[in-house]
Amino acid sequence: MFNLKNRNFLTLMDFTPKEINYFLDLARDLKRAKYTGTEVQRLKGKNIALIFEKASTRTRCAFEVGAKDQGAHVTYLGPTGSHIGKKESAADTARVLGRMYDGIEYRGFGQEIVETLAEYAGVPVWNGLTDEDHPTQILADFLTIREHFNKPLNEIKFAYVGDGANNMANALMIGAVKMGMDFRIVSPKEIPTDAALVAKCKEIAAGTGAKVTITDNIEEGVKGCDVLYTDVWVSMGEPDSVWESKIKLLTPYRVDMNMIKMTGNPDAKFMHCLPAFHDEETAVGKEIKEKYGLSEMEVSHELFESKYSIVFDEAENRMHTIKAVMVATLGDQ
């Protein structure tokens, strides 16, 4: 039994492989309990603050439903609902909320903000996404891989294909090296992954048996993979010039049925943290079609809707893994 009580959850860098496995085992057990109606509430009487400086569907719903299932109360502070960083510093906000709440979730911008909250709050702080990292997503991804593959994580070959400089590339690489995986980032040279983070992850890999490969060669990068993973190419709010240059660079890296075939693995799976631009059924999808003539972006519609895609199992597992983080760090054992 691991005692993670009162620990912050800011990045998987802070946890050992055994601790990460504990989160995953607890999430599995909580998922089973929810399905069988045998869940025991370990967060009764707890109050949780959810700070969202960026919009969210899965993360917000996962925290709210997970907390409710476990008997906790939540307060949602949206992009206009708190003064953090505008009228009040992160340190002051942390000291105020830490007096009223038992745990604080933060989804927003720089990693330094969530770290400041954790330093000053005096209660567990959980990272719901920053510009640099997305650790709760990785727990959901790894639980999903466990469910779909009859082998341990350290035997999984995993390729992240697309924008090698974004927070998902960072977060997946950290998680993968901790768990001893064969991890590849397949991305154009013009969009490099953070060199200091790559060096740090290679250091960790030397101790866990993991492998880290950064390549712009798609065929080489996806060969033999169990999982192909991608994320959106551009973020909302980025200027048109960035969209144009990124789309040009990344179009050859769209994950599709042909790329799945290139793995040579009939059991390969496709994953995506969502939302995904795979059709024209959204306002953004329509805009992309009008401006760039593309009906799909980072993943083909065919693959997204195919038997290889496990994206909705992955999305559901956001809730079970986030619940596990709250229970492990805040719950009555």
UniProtKB/Swiss-Prot annotation:
Keywords, in A-Z order: Arginine metabolism, Cytoplasm, Transferase
Pathway: Amino-acid degradation; L-arginine degradation via ADI pathway; carbamoyl phosphate from L-arginine: step 2/2
GO molecular function: amino acid binding; ornithine carbamoyltransferase activity
Cellular localisation: Cytoplasm
Binding locations of L-ornithine: N167, D231, S235, M236
UniProt function note: Reversibly catalyzes the transfer of the carbamoyl group from carbamoyl phosphate (CP) to the N(epsilon) atom of ornithine (ORN) to produce L-citrulline.
Protein name: Ornithine carbamoyltransferase
Organism listed in the record: Clostridium botulinum (strain Kyoto / Type A2)
